[in-house]
Design a protein with these regions (language model features):
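Pre-Walker A (Motif I) flank of P-loop NTPase domains
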Residues: 72-77, 104, 158, 298-299
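Conserved helix-turn-beta segment of the N-terminal RecA-like "Helicase ATP-binding" lobe
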Residues: 113-140, 151-153, 322-326
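Conserved pre-motif I regulatory segment
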Residues: 41-79
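Conserved SF1/SF2 helicase motif Ia
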Residues: 82, 89-120, 128-129, 294-298
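Residues at the beta-strand->loop junction immediately N-terminal to the Walker
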Residues: 79-80, 304
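Inter-lobe coupling linker of SF2 helicases/translocases
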Residues: 145-192, 204, 211, 218-249, ...
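Walker B catalytic acidic pair
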Residues: 253-254
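Charged, low-complexity intrinsically disordered regions
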Residues: 1-37, 127, 152, 156-157, ...
């Protein structure tokens, strides 16, 4: 009923604007002035064959050269598809930042499993460069890590290449972290005040609080506990913090690692918004802000082949790292402003993890799409596989030119397992609020079991039967090709 009334109010507001042309013209002028005033800049590949210091044995593609030119102008999200050459792009960009003195010590953050390959490619492209690549075994243990960090801090490196695991263990100065958390506490208290909550300084939930205020107070309590734990932590003598390393440019590969942004929202009833705090994302944001303070908002670069995997919140999170000033210009520096400008919630009936159905509300409709794309492309350099000349010749074609869908019947055994999962979910639903909080992991566990059961019942329990109808067996049948027998 409430959602229907909300829709009626929105429709009445739109009708009022349409019936009063002078108001419509005034609002259109405000919107175009504040939100629709960007033209996507075109970047040209420089007319050089090789960058200064780079080997002549490697030729960069035009989109890589354009990416370097763009990165030298502003912080950028490189949404480049897998295999399009982000390694050479990041290496060249880091070396050019160093050459033109836009950065003194650029750092590239890569996956630990690929750091040796990345470092080898970087040294191949720039044979005479002073490149420090810290593999995982060089930073295992506190003493090894301290030695490695001292090497970064004391060396005059052209490039520093770090694995994600090591980078995540480098702490910021506790004084900076405390100040950063305090800023977040102030924002949350202001949000409680704007929602009409009494005693915004307190994290204690009042019976008169609205659902939104209750959720904000829970976030406030968590942040206060984090700040207190930081203050109670004993001082580490001789500790080397991120601020001591001299790094003044960050180039983060596989940026989806940091997409679980640590942000708060008043849209607590919207499904699909991952509002849970990620220590990695919180830590990354602190380091990003430190570098932006040193460089006037520059020198932050992210690369990922999957910038959006779940929700539009990921677009906002990536832009919050790289282009916070652009979000401010659009008036969407807070997530709720972004969501209200570019999305619309939709209430639908959806299956639960047990196969039953419930009504949920999600951000599924987009609005002001042209302006949103303009904002995104102002911050992001997007390259698809088909944008790379000759890519189609390197990739095998699909059979019949499209994916093949294989539909399987549910086995009787799978039906029994799913019914058992449903029963356990119904039992959890009947628990009291306190019991649910103590067993909050149950829905996620059941969801995982249901996903595994759909693939093969033995993934739920090894003693379950090997059913011919399972997806794993169907995959084997579809892919297995018997080796030709010699006569």
């Amino acid at each position: 009923v409430a959602r229907q009334k909300q829709k009626e109010i929105q429709d009445a507001f739109r009708s009022y604007i349409m019936d009063h042309n002078d108001i419509g013209v005034s609002l259109a002028h405000i919107f175009n002035t504040e939100k629709n005033n960007y033209v996507i800049r075109k970047y040209e590949a420089p007319s050089i064959d090789h960058y200064p210091g780079a080997t002549k044995l490697v030729n960069l593609r035009d989109h890589q050269k354009r990416g370097v030119s763009r990165g030298l102008q502003s912080s950028t999200i490189f949404a480049h598809a897998v295999g399009t050459g982000k390694t050479y792009l990041f290496t060249t960009l880091g070396m050019e930042l160093r050459r033109i003195k836009a950065a003194r010590k650029p750092a590239i953050i890569v996956q630990g499993s690929t750091i040796k390959q990345f470092a080898a490619s970087a040294r191949k492209l720039y044979p005479t460069a002073k490149i420090l690549a810290l593999t995982k075994d060089m930073t295992n243990g506190t003493e090894n890590r301290r030695t490695a960090l001292a090497k970064i801090a004391s060396g005059d490196w052209d490039l520093v290449i770090l694995p994600h695991s090591t980078y995540n263990l480098i702490k910021c100065n506790p004084i900076r972290e405390a100040g950063f958390i305090q800023e977040q506490l102030d924002e949350i208290r202001e949000a409680i005040r704007s929602e009409g909550g009494h005693s915004p300084e307190s994290s204690k939930v009042n019976r008169s609080d609205s659902l939104t205020v209750k959720q904000l107070r829970k976030i406030l309590k968590r942040k206060e506990a984090r700040l207190q734990a930081l203050r109670d932590k004993p001082h580490e003598d001789g500790a080397i913090y991120f601020e001591d390393l001299g790094i003044d440019a960050l180039l983060g590969d596989e940026a989806h690692t940091w997409k679980r942004g640590d942000f708060f929202t008043k849209m607590g009833n919207i499904k699909g918004l991952d509002r849970s705090a990620s220590q990695k994302s919180f830590d990354f944001l602190m380091k990003v802000r430190y570098i932006q303070e040193k460089t006037g908002g520059k020198n932050i670069y992210l690369a990922t082949g999957t910038p959006i995997s779940n929700t539009l919140a990921e677009i906002w999170t990536l832009m919050r790292y790289t282009r916070p000033e652009l979000l401010r210009e659009y008036g969407v520096e807070h997530f709720d402003g972004f969501a209200s400008l570019f999305t619309e919630s939709v209430s639908e009936i959806e299956p639960t993890e047990t196969g039953e159905f419930r009504q949920v509300e999600r951000l599924k409709k987009y609005r002001n799409g042209y302006e949103m794309i303009n904002m995104w492309l102002t911050a992001a350099d997007v390259i698809l596989q088909e944008d790379v000349p000759g890519w189609a010749d390197m990739v095998p074609a699909f059979k019949n030119g499209e994916h093949t869908n294989i539909v399987l019947d549910r086995s009787e055994e799978l039906g029994q397992v799913i019914e058992s999962i449903r029963q356990r979910r119904r039992e959890w639903d009947e628990l009291s609020g306190k019991e649910k909080r103590n067993q909050s992991y149950v829905p996620l566990v059941l969801y995982g079991e249901a996903k595994k059961a759909a693939i093969d019942l033995r993934m739920v329990h090894p003693q379950n039967p090997d059913t011919p109808e399972s997806k794993s067996n169907a995959c084997v049948k579809a892919e297995y090709r018997p080796r030709a027998v010699r006569v």
